[in-house]
Regions:
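Beta-rich strand-turn-strand
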Residues: 104-107
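Short, well-ordered loop/turn sites that connect or cap secondary structure elements
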Residues: 113-114, 133
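Glycine- and Gly-Pro-enriched alpha-helical subdomains that act as flexible
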Residues: 117-120, 125-127
Length: 197
C-alpha cells in the first residue's frame, strides 16, 4: 500500500490519538461509519487487536507496510527486546526527530521539510526522511517555515533531544527509551502480528 493521503481524522476516530498524524481533535469520540456509534458490544478478534496496533504505528510514523516489515525484520536481528528496538528505529528517523524537536506540526509536515531539502544534519543537506539519526548529530534549518513552526508548535521536547529555538537547531543527545515515546501502542502485539512473516 502506498502512502496514505486520505482523511486523517477518520483514522484518529478509529484508532485513537495519533499525534504524528494530525493535530486536529475529532468532534465525535466513536469510529466513523454510516449509522453512528454501534449500540451492541462486538467482541474484537485477536487478529483485529493486533492489526489495529500495527495500523497505529504505520499511520503515526507515515511508513508503508513494506517499510514497517523491513524495520521489524531488522529489529529481530538485533540484540535486545524486539518491540523496543522497533520503536527506537522509528523514533530515530530524521522526520520523527524534526517533529519531536518542534520544527513541524506533524510527522507528515516534517517529512515534507526533509524531502524538500530544508533540513541539514551536521551541516550536510539530507533529503531522505528515513535517515537514521545517531547520537551527537546536530539537526539544523534556516528555512523560514521551520523557524516559524519551531516558535509556534514547540511543545515539550523529549529528554533525549536538546533544542535551541532561536537558531532552529537541535541535537540528538542519546538514543530514545521506551518511556520517552509519546505514542500509546503495545509493541508486543505488533511483533506477534508479524511473527508469521
Amino acid at each position: 500500500m502506498a502512502r496514505y493521503r486520505g482523511p486523517r481524522v477518520k483514522i484518529v476516530r478509529r484508532l485513537g490519538e495519533l499525534p504524528g498524524l494530525t493535530t486536529k481533535i475529532p468532534n465525535r469520540n466513536y469510529p466513523a461509519g454510516q449509522h453512528g456509534p454501534s449500540s451492541g458490544m462486538t467482541k474484537m478478534s485477536q487478529y483485529r487487536v493486533r492489526l489495529q496496533e500495527k495500523q497505529k504505528l504505520r499511520y503515526n510514523y507515515g511508513v508503508s507496510e513494506k517499510q514497517l516489515l523491513g524495520y521489524v525484520r531488522r529489529a529481530r536481528r538485533m540484540k535486545g527486546p524486539t518491540g523496543e528496538l522497533l520503536l527506537q528505529m522509528l523514533e530515530m528517523r530524521l522526520d520523527s526527530i524534526v517533529y519531536r524537536l518542534g520544527f513541524a506540526p506533524t510527522i507528515r509536515a516534517a517529512r515534507q521539510y526533509v524531502s524538500h531539502g530544508l533540513v541539514t544534519v551536521n551541516g550536510q543537506c539530507v533529503t531522505i526522511p528515513s535517515y537514521q539519526c545517531s547520537t551527537g548529530e546536530v539537526i539544523k534549518s534556516t528555512a523560514a517555515p521551520i523557524v516559524e513552526h519551531s516558535k509556534t508548535y514547540g511543545g515539550v521536547v523529549p529528554s533525549h533531544l536538546s533544542v535551541d529555538k532561536n537558531n532552529a537547531t537541535g541535537k540528538v543527545e542519546r538514543n530514545v527509551t521506551r518511556s520517552q515515546i509519546g505514542l500509546t501502542v503495545n509493541e508486543l502485539l505488533i511483533i506477534e502480528f508479524y511473527s508469521r512473516k
